[in-house]
Amino acid sequence: MRKLLLFLFVLPFCVWAQHPDDVRIINQLCSQEFSGRGYVNSGDSLAAEYIALEFKKLGLRPQKRSFFQGFGFRVNAFPGKLSFSINGNLLIPGKDYVVNPSSPSAKLDRETMVFLDKFSRVEDVVEALPQLDPAKHIIVLDKSKFISRDDQIVLRASIAKLSEVMPVILLNEGTPIWHVSQNQWNFPVFEVDKTVFQEGVIKAEIEAKIINHSARNVVARIKSKGKPRRRIVFTAHYDHLGRMGQNTFYPGANDNASGVTLMIAIARKIRKLPRSSTEYVFIAFAGEEVGLLGSKFFVQNPMFDLKSIRFLVNLDIFGGAQHSITAVNGTIYHEEFECLVNTNKEMNVTPEIKSRGESANSDHHYFHAAGVRSFFLYSGGNNKHYHVPTDEAQDVDMILVDKCADLMVRFVGRL
């Protein structure tokens, strides 16, 4: 009896635990070897090969002859030198500053800073340009002065205009976030943390290169019993920002190694279930950070009839499910949202599941636009490491990844 009581006491605490494969996968996706899964050192290509291997190890099959669907796009990459100093003080890339992703290669030595006050029209900036010398001057703008949405629209347009003729420094509140661009401006733009900025001599060096990049979506399936009557599709983008210079890389744990790891965990659990008339498809997209390019290409070049999809679940940013989960399109697909909420109430995985309307903010978008019923699910929390080098695997709750995988399996099983 004592042994039985001990077993009953321990069981509730052993239902969920971090799966060693989940830990291994997210650590590898976020490793230096994969270089932030971007466009330097073949980072995204290495990640694609790795994900395909994980699918194969689970016994999943390719949708066609290969796990890969290739496509291409241009991107501005930063494969080499990157430095920025003020009065001889070398700043830390990714922490103290970032180089705007549309910046070109450049070597700067500027002694004269020109501070521009807040303005409400792009024309106000253009009028000041003839008085400045791009070989001597660098413009400084304080982002915190541009508060409203209209102000920010004007600021973005002005930066693009200024960079045609002059290097620019944007002062940022805290660590600036980084992005990816497909274009190059004439002059570089730097975003610098205000707390480390000072007036003085600016010296900087950037190596940037526009490349015609070959990328691959990774597509796998769990075959149905006989001809599939319908398909359930899980998606997650695996690409991230890569490297900003050779020495600074963005691991992208929450965005979106967490979603890829969760998707593979879901595949592992479904693979153990008896085969049914449903075919399960798992797609790891490339090119999301550049503008949803991988999912757009798939929808335009589908490997199966999109009308056969009963439901699609896109997983993007899943490191904070201890706070909540939000379903984009939750206010549109009421039946599925109610099913997800009720399933979570039974399983007690996350404190709250919120709904919101449609939004073109992740890889579900082109499927939804094509008439596919779909959710984009993301976790809550303040996401304080968004697009910064501190988005690391150690901060993702891997026990919650396993719990969310069980939630997803039960949810789609009820559709």
Regions found by a protein language model. Give the residues of each.
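Boundary at the C-terminal end of the N-terminal hydrophobic targeting segment
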Residues: 15-17
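Metal-dependent peptidase/peptidase-like ectodomains
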Residues: 275, 285-385
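His/Asp/Glu-rich mid-to-C-terminal helical/loop segments that flank catalytic regions of hydrolases
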Residues: 384-415
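Second-shell loop/turn segments in exported
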Residues: 32-42, 57, 69-72, 113-119, ...
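Sec-dependent N-terminal signal peptides
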Residues: 3-13
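Soluble metallo-hydrolase cores and metallopeptidase-like ectodomains found primarily
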Residues: 110, 119-123, 171-252, 268, ...
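Catalytic-core environment of secreted peptidases
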Residues: 19-34, 39, 50, 54-62, ...
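Noncatalytic luminal/extracellular "stalk/propeptide" segments of secretory-pathway proteins
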Residues: 35-141
